[in-house]
Amino acid sequence: MYSNNQRSRIGSHTWKIAFLFAFLALLVDGADLMLLSYSLNSIKAEFNLSTVEAGMLGSFTLAGMAIGGIFGGWACDRFGRVRIVVISILTFSILTCGLGLTQSFIQFGVLRFFASLGLGSLYIACNTLMAEYVPTKYRTTVLGTLQAGWTVGYIVATLLAGWLIPDHGWRVLFYVAIIPVLMAVLMHFFVPEPAAWQQSRLAPSKQTETVKTSAFKLIFQDKRNRNMFILWALTAGFLQFGYYGVNNWMPSYLESELGMKFKEMTAYMVGTYTAMILGKILAGFMADKLGRRFTYAFGAIGTAIFLPLIVFYNSPDNILYLLVIFGFLYGIPYGVNATYMTESFPTAIRGTAIGGAYNVGRLGAAIAPATIGFLASGGSIGLGFVVMGAAYFICGVIPALFIKEKQYDPQQS
């Protein structure tokens, strides 16, 4: 139970402190996720893996993130947004560091799965936390900027990989993951739970019953909540099928099929991710001005168009330009996704609903890396990217036709 004293810790600038920690949390989340992509070829060679087995490591990651996100969403509603952010960071930091000690495919896969439980719950907890701190007028701009933290993490991982792997090997890259433990400890002491969540825990009758009743039961008893949950689960499934399939295999595609050397590839990926940051931030401005629905569909369908262009029309002269434009479009759906979803559900079930819908979708997306691995073994990674483009098109059409924006205000309990 939260007291008036705890609620009084929230001042006019508290949301800025919360934003700083949430941004850094998503930065390390994104960096941790990309460590596998850049070390995949080295791990594949050392453990003598097939292409399908290499893809399965990405699928283990997504399966862990899915289960972690579903549980983390429920835990956010039950125990608090900040508390789950802290626990998530501690979980994936310690276990990811342990990946550097593994000696086989099975050891790596099992430990990666458990580390990914923290990766999945962190994304839901951070976005729910900030949605409840930021006023509606600026919410998408702030949350879009927050999503850029993930992409800054990609760049950090890219630079670390280019620096460490060629001279020190892939294991050292994973040892670095222990550093965010310090940040988790500091966040525990400096960031209070948002007022809307605290109030929902103090309110008598209805909110108390919500805590005692299964949140998933509350979601599926209400037709509106049930429909939103199903639509968002479908949208999230296609979004993540495309996003993680491309994210997991793009470095390998540039190396193996376009013939880039490792350091050259990392430079190209930095350019792509820099454009992605811009896409996420501008998506926030666009969504506040033009609407969540339009901006989301524009980014998803634009990405669907550009994936085949990269595969069929790339050349040494234009590949950088194609990757930069692709990176910009690729970032837009995630710049809007958090706000769009959080405004689709009421406070009492928000964490559970978002975590459930997003991560039911992620379970479907867990097959994406292995799917591209299978297609690559019989053809090319590029063929898999075309399939990912089709998934992006569908994920843009569903919300454009069926999901209204601004259904609930996250600042209201």
Swiss-Prot record:
Annotated transmembrane regions: 17-37, 54-74, 86-106, 113-133, 146-166, 172-192, 229-249, 267-287, 294-314, 319-339, 353-376, 383-403
Keyword annotations: Cell inner membrane, Cell membrane, Membrane, Transmembrane, Transmembrane helix, Transport
InterPro entries, A to Z: MFS (IPR011701), MFS_AAHS (IPR004746), MFS_dom (IPR020846), MFS_trans_sf (IPR036259), Sugar_transporter_CS (IPR005829)
Alphabetical list of CDD domains matching this protein: MFS_MucK (cd17371)
Listed GO CC annotations: plasma membrane
A GO molecular-function descriptor: carboxylic acid transmembrane transporter activity
Main location: membrane
Domain of life: Bacteria
The UniProt record lists the keyword Cell inner membrane: yes
Subcellular localization(s) per the UniProt record: Cell inner membrane
Membrane topology classification: Multi-pass membrane protein
Cytoplasmic membrane side: 1-16, 75-85, 134-145, 193-228, 288-293, 340-352, 404-413
The keyword Transmembrane appears for this protein: yes
Membrane topology, Periplasmic segments: 38-53, 107-112, 167-171, 250-266, 315-318, 377-382
Pfam families xref list: MFS_1 (PF07690)
Job description of the protein: Probable uptake of muconate.
UniProt xrefs under NCBIfam families: 2A0115
Family: Belongs to the major facilitator superfamily. Aromatic acid:H(+) symporter (AAHS) (TC 2.A.1.15) family.
Name of this chain's protein: Cis,cis-muconate transport protein
